[in-house]
Amino acid sequence: MGKILARVETEGFAVRAARMIHMSKSDAQGFYHVHAARPFFGALTDFMSSDPCLVLCLEAPDAIKKWRDLMGATDPAKAAVGSLRKEFGRSIDHNATHGSDAPETAAFELGYFFRGLELR
């Protein structure tokens, strides 16, 4: 995690909030509910509830696009050299990072993990 956090700072993101969590299966199912009908849902929620995760709220100009560019393609084998997923991902299922894809998604995801915390 330290190497990813170092890249976060190097790339100009500010960490507005951070939590180390260990999601229950139910937490993972709630967080990834948009994928409930997908064939990978069970494996995804099993994996996400298997070990602790570091959840971050990042801030930067055009943060969503900037973060998604830094993460790289979902499949580490197809991710650009220098991206987090290329460097730290092991497979499409274990790709090291997650990122919101739109402001509405970010609002849900931040609310899911940082309930009651005022974030702009």
Give the residues covered by each predicted segment:
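Non-catalytic terminal and connector segments of soluble metabolic enzymes
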Residues: M1-R120
